[in-house]
Amino acid sequence: MFALVERQTGQVVGFGGLIHFAGRGEPEIKYALLRAAWGRGLATEAACALLDFARDRGLPEVIATVDPQHGASQRVLAKAGMERGELRDEEDGTQTQMFYWRAVPR
């Protein structure tokens, strides 16, 4: 995980990274921002940087899981270049919206 630091202030405003859950073949992008940092493009910037990080390390695919009701996070992932996938039924009865990214050589 990486700290997300606002350039202007030097303050940590969130975190982001790629995590690899046991039993899954591809890493998953995760990020979170303080509410005060929402709406300024920081999540999109972080997601793009994390996907660049994945590409630079030769990772062929990254996934993301999002609450189907969380439109802002879905827009962030789409802007970062991820493609919306299927709705996945979870063991606890909830659903998760899947997003996928596949590396394209530069």
Place the predicted regions along the sequence by residue.
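Acyl-donor (CoA/ACP) binding surface of acyl/acetyltransferases
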Residues: M1-R106
